[in-house]
């Protein structure tokens, strides 16, 4: 299959992923990287495999984008020095940008929302979080929506 055909059929996957992760800054750069990766993936895709081309591209591009985020976070370590320090020879404290944003998010949330977010980031499923917090699944979903709303309102 020619790449033009693949592109015409599946370019919306790239837009969907960029929207899913709220990419607005450097949108074009991420789009270009994902487009190059789509071309590479179209070259190695085997039509005889059980997975459809669209799900193959979506899965691989999603993980590739996550890898790009991880690489970027490793490069964006910030050195924070105390304001009172007369010299920079003291031991600096390292934080990465992700940790700093997470601290900002936690300041916005109430106790139940912070606990939900902590458990969610640790990889627990919604029903597991409901059991741990002794709440109904519908309450957990409301907490999730509240956290999402607060994050979007304050960080977009």
UniProtKB/Swiss-Prot annotation:
Protein name: RNA polymerase sigma factor SigS
Motif Polymerase core binding: chain residues: 29-44
Function statement: Sigma factors are initiation factors that promote the attachment of RNA polymerase to specific initiation sites and are then released. Sigma-S contributes to the protection against external stress, thus playing a role in cellular fitness and survival.
Alphabetical keyword list: DNA-binding, Sigma factor, Transcription, Transcription regulation
Gene: sigS
GO biological process, one term: DNA-templated transcription initiation
InterPro entries (alphabetical): RNA_pol_sigma-70_dom, RNA_pol_sigma70_r2, RNA_pol_sigma_r2, Sig_transdc_resp-reg_C-effctor, WH-like_DNA-bd_sf
Family listed: Belongs to the sigma-70 factor family.
Organism: Staphylococcus aureus (strain JH9)
NCBIfam families: sigma70-ECF
DNA bind region: 126-145
Listed SUPFAM superfamilies: C-terminal effector domain of the bipartite response regulators (SSF46894), Sigma2 domain of RNA polymerase sigma factors (SSF88946)
One MF term in the entry's GO annotations: DNA binding
């Amino acid at each position: 299959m020619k790449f033009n055909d693949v592109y015409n059929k599946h370019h919306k996957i790239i837009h969907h992923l960029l929207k899913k992760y709220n990419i607005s800054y450097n949108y074009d750069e991420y789009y270009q990287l994902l487009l190059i990766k789509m071309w590479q993936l179209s070259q190695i895709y085997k039509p005889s495999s059980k997975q459809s081309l669209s799900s193959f591209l979506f899965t691989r591009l999603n993980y590739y984008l996550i890898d790009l985020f991880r690489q970027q976070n490793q490069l964006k370590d910030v050195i924070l020095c105390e304001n009172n320090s007369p010299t920079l020879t003291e031991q600096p404290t390292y934080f990465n940008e992700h940790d700093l944003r997470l601290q900002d998010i936690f300041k916005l949330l109430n106790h139940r929302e912070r606990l939900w977010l902590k458990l969610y980031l640790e990889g627990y499923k919604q029903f597991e979080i409901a059991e741990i917090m002794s709440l109904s699944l519908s309450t957990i979903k409301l907490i999730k929506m509240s956290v999402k709303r607060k994050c979007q309102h304050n960080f977009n």
